[in-house]
């Protein structure tokens, strides 16, 4: 008995190359989410370590907004990365720093780091929420690395309130997890 099946199967490498080509043609940036369960668990640190690896690989990468919270280890990881200066916006008589979305779009890096996805922007920003800024960056074809805690996702808001007794006011639509090309815990 002979096998008449002469179908040639593509190699995994060929399939990966095809998927990457299709992704590049879509014009849409890719989202990488560094997900944590609480403040201080190392999301920003992990994001910066991944960013430094991409930089060593030759990727064009900028820091759109990272909050080090005064941690020297986090500040050390920022050294040598290109920082997009923050915008200062007046609110309630105080100047507050915000991510400069227009400067990032004008610079058009391959990858931008955007800390604190659930952040509410100061009135006067183009978008009410930072996750909306991220959607605009993705639509412009820029890959985004971002950080967020699990309790900020809309579908978990009620559950978190029941467990902790705290209502989380800054929420992120679940669809951002759905579109993420990678989620790091």
PLM features: residue spans?
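Anion (oxyanion) recognition and catalysis
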Residues: 55, 138-139, 177
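Extreme N-terminal, non-catalytic leader segments
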Residues: 1-34, 64
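Conserved nucleotide-binding/hydrolysis micro-motifs of P-loop NTPases
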Residues: 53, 67-72, 118-119, 144, ...
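Internal gly/pro-rich beta-alpha loop/helix module
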Residues: 146-185
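Short gly/ser/thr-rich secondary-structure transition/capping motifs
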Residues: 15-18, 92-98, 165-167
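Conserved P-loop
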Residues: 28-106
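Loop/turn-to-beta-strand initiation segments
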Residues: 60, 108-111, 137-146
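Conserved ATPase-coupling elements of RecA-like P-loop NTPase cores
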Residues: 116-131, 155-158
